[in-house]
Amino acid sequence: MSTIHDVLARPSPEPYLSWASHGPNVYSESWLPVSEWTPWVDFTIQNLTSTYAQVLNAHWSGGDPQSIGISGRFDLLVPDERSLVPVAIRERRAASIINLGQEPLGLGPGSFGQNIASPDLGLFSVPTPASQEKLDILLPGLTKLSTKWYPEMRLSEHQSVRSEWALPLSQVSTCAALSDCRYGFLITDEALVVLRFTKKRIDVSGTQSGDDSDPAGVVNVELLPPEYAVIHMSSSGKDNLTVKLAVFCLCLMASGGHDKLDYGYPPLSPDDYQP
């Protein structure tokens, strides 16, 4: 019988960009500026499998493992970014195969989010109809075509290319700041980029004031350059970090009581990160 890790170690089929659109990324002056990022050094296969060993070694109970992923060539056709959203959400069953014992969760379209930098998709807490509580985003994400954005754009000698690289990061950083989310991600037809955000300390002469998050749409918190890790769609095998495994573990982090922004975080280990 397959374990959860066995299923999540399978590769994610790469979408087929037959008529993929080109052009600039969206922009808003209200977004937080991003000009740098830094490697998320402890987001590794070794740390994740150690931290979540009990979950990952459990028997797979999500039905036919072959249903996780995409099989038909037509399903892989991605002419624009909107078409990439359902492709990315096909991985959502990997985020819902265990009961976290708290509130229901769902990985779905970002139209549920309501702020100046709404994500394309994300992990949401789903309240019961009787509770009348709002739908809270725990993990904001953006979809981008590799014809418009890829991580290596940061290394370009052209300022215009580096500026385009920064725009999606500014958008998801702003969404994270407004929603008080510690984690986020960007997913393209070629790779998943996981992100962790950290608040910047402001001295007494700084201008930061008020609440750290503002649902009215004004960002009242400053962030350090985001930490990132890149996982390619072609990655597979239990010794490697795959897109499915990375999404699964990121959802565990965001829903396990370690989802709020802070000024620093403990190393990724079983002692500090348990669902």
What are these regions (language model features)?
Residues 1-166, 198-275:
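Eukaryotic intrinsically disordered, low-complexity regulatory regions enriched in Ser/Thr and Pro
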